[in-house]
């Protein structure tokens, strides 16, 4: 989030993120979605593939 916020000078989406009062929620939701994605990925693999 910090590096994204630094792009506010050149990126209009980053600028909108900085102006939002829901930054913490967006970061939290992103973390949750990453966990869901990793879990789904893991469920499609066997143990050997996951460890590799």
From Swiss-Prot:
One of its GO terms (biological process) is DNA replication. SUPFAM superfamilies: P-loop containing nucleoside triphosphate hydrolases (SSF52540). It is found in: Host nucleus. It catalyses: Couples ATP hydrolysis with the unwinding of duplex DNA by translocating in the 3'-5' direction; ATP + H2O = ADP + phosphate + H(+). GO terms for molecular function: ATP binding; ATP hydrolysis activity; DNA binding; DNA helicase activity. GO terms for cellular component: host cell nucleus. Belongs to the papillomaviridae E1 protein family. This is Replication protein E1. It comes from Human papillomavirus type 53.
């Amino acid at each position: 989030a910090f590096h994204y916020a630094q792009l506010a000078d050149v990126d209009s989406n980053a600028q909108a993120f900085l102006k939002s009062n829901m930054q913490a929620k967006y970061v939290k939701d992103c973390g949750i979605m990453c966990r869901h994605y990793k879990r789904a990925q893991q469920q499609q693999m066997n143990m050997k593939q996951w460890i590799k």
